[in-house]
């Protein structure tokens, strides 16, 4: 219940007027609000303003004015001494109001300090008023259909009791009701009364409330990179108009069509016309490029550097040190992208996930539910299971594919589950989980089942750990007892998961299956973003991590542009140095400044510890000589006109590199080529300027694959051949006045540039695979990975020269490829006017194992002119109220990047501690400059005129200083035993020993009994791809109800499906054997008699071989006679007729035809699987929400098979459903030959 409070009694002061102006620019919302409060008490009171902060929200301006005195705020460093007087209170957990220490300071816990802005406003006179002005910027959430959801903070629209009743409205919808078209009823219709809204007062959470109605004025300007297809509001009637000074049709003005009744919050839904296309938004800085250059050159430290060393690269390095401080001064590009994942059907057979189950002692009572969840997983997923008490004991050293052996071992381990003694340590379990190595194309999902209620301090540390690793996994938490709701809800909210709480008498199975359905929904993982910028620009990219995207998630990336051509000297002859500097979101400190390397030297760098989850940054390099006056181009552009063979494009791109021919020819064209160039150097931070050097021979170690580590790459990363830079329309000029050689230079300006990519360091699993050059297309198969290290050997990267093996004799040279350098003294041909600068962005990712690609571009002529030396057009006057929203969000993202680097990793070495301190300093400086919130800064009330701290103002402190999480890295954390405890596989699991949950051998060494487990270097084993199975995730199927005659039978129970589920194989099939017959309670003879395969009926007596399917007509179920004669008859033991093969290789057995043992086993397994599906529909229909995924996996396996004997899937399922009708007749002792219906029509 945020708002303005009197801290002595924490009573809210009433709001009398709310004035709100907003601007929605794509997915970014800027808000300027003016709130007027009244003091109803007869004496003056102190004021404390409480404002709830959304995730990634920045409050850039605050001012409280009362009686001519204005109070503002500024961010200062959070010192440990500030919390000294607060430590005696101990950490608070969920207190409804701020506590007070012995010195009278207001004390907030860490979670409250992160999610709430609490500022003293000064004294309010008796019966006086106070006006609070607020400026904020935030990111708008999106829905799966791409709709943006705008919800104003409730402090701007608090709930108030209804005013005097008006004339009654007629029931239902009417034409004169402005809210009827939006489906919004009146207050009486919704039954919303002020008494129902009453709740315990909590100043940190819940909707804001006001004791009396107030006036409300609202106006929102909606603009963006695309047109708006529509807008609606579930709460209010809206009016949309064109603003009087709108520059395009993409800008509209939204106001309220009727008065605000103070009974609900304001919500608006924006429908973009291109909801699932990437968009780029450009926002100019507060200074032009010339003003920024003059500002930097006027600095004394820059002048000292210039006197010592006039090298241009050193000057660029100086700028890089200031990039995070000068974000507000330079232009910013924002990338927004909401992929269309909701339209993709739930293909259970192609969903790739890594699932980690974390169980504490309370999970022992829910073994059946855990077994059901494990059995419901698709075979291509990775799985691991760990139990935790005081210690964490995983079953496997790393996650393994869901093979038959692995699933059987996990299920047997769950049956004999013994949880380590001691209270459950959720922090240790999550620390182990996030420290596991990531697997490419396998987004991680955590399933935490616990009843733990940790202390408040442990809860805060656990939430902080998940905050810094929230991009690595989604957490689905299940509270099995009197657990801490704040902990589980916080974990799920931070990781975009979901929290479930089990009430007494409730079953866990539906909750687990529902969470599994959400975990297996379509996802876009392993996302990389390549930014192509002009040569004269350095860029700062943020965020440094790109998590996997699920339906409703959107990718927001920011790129701050810095023009450095005025600082970097141009080499003579149009030749560029081999290396240029690039900027990332993390920058080197002065002591790490790289010196200008001499030609022939190799830049060096250091890489980050692997446990921090970061990937080394790479250097970028120019692709073109920028001196247009001294370089010549050819007429034919190999990108647009590669010659007779379009596949030769990459060859010519390779030849065009300056390293190919250095002395006698000059490059004619340069493009962002996918082919290799000089090797890249790695650095734990974005490198400074490296001098001219020869990078040949540089082959840094390749860091592990990480999901979403953002950095820079040399040139265009490998695998980007589907996205060449487009050639813009050439500027008009006189053709007759120019030579033929000059005509080919029209594409040079757009093609010259540099690629900045994120994230780097991923292995190219299938090198040399060509990709389709189509926008937004699905690429055909695995492709070279973005950000690949380009300096690796030929054996590591495949054919580095060409995209595919080709005959060099077929390589045809396009005309005018090379032109000779004009002799000295000769005038060079006249220059062509350069093209306008552009920025091009390429987004790549994996949906399952299918590569995806999107691209988008934007012109930069509004910033730096059209490129011909003329001044850029003057931008339209922009109202200062919006306060550079994109810049503020960029700065907030940079702050989070540096906070993660400072807090995530350990500090075992001096280098680690120095690196953490530098990141802490950058986060601190960026936060102070841009007003972005940080855990290293705290807001302090100051006088708005003098900017001095108010001496008598109420101080707000945090009970805990910001420090790294109290757990060391996962590799050194709570796994006390030297070897990981595992199990003995010889003949099942041994009974659990008192030492832990899993058994180990006498020496304590791990025993790998699962076939050939995946090793960390080889990655997970993947089963062969299967045809996708369409699974409807969003609606319930209408299934057959149990037979009324069997209602009192044990077969009619709704929850007796677990014996059958236990028999399901990992691919989804069942075996036709004695255990299966016992699970479905149908004799083996009846199953064989009702089988549509003749081989099963032939195994019975000759009299019954043709019954009952002789009535189906010829061709159905009639196999080859040779097949029936060579098929072995079933034994009377435990093995059924289908238990001939080992059960593996079902996908290949279908191709063997109906002959041999494989065909016999396939017949038995397909018939048993169809019977199992029909049995679940007839016997356990009421428990559909529990066995839904199990049945979907079985159905997916059935659809992937090629049935023998000419039988199709529909006939097989019809035979299985008809079996239960036959069972009814058999139970009633009827003669089958007297039946007057055909089972094929059932």
From Swiss-Prot:
Name the Gene3D superfamilies on file: von Willebrand factor, type A domain (3.40.50.410)
User: Can you give the residue ranges of the VWFA domain?
Assistant: 354-527
* Comp. bias regions, Polar residues: 605-619
Supply the Pfam families for this chain.
VIT_2, VWA_3
Source superkingdom: Eukaryota
Using the record's annotation, list all stretches that form the VIT domain: 1-138
- The annotated region (Disordered) lies at 569-650, 670-726, 751-794, 957-976, 987-1055, 1118-1159
Q: Where is the composition biased (Low complexity)?
A: 588-604, 681-700, 1125-1138
Name of the molecule in the record:
von Willebrand factor A domain-containing protein 5B2
Q: Which organism is it from?
A: Homo sapiens (Human)
Query: Which gene is the coding source of this polypeptide chain?
Result: VWA5B2
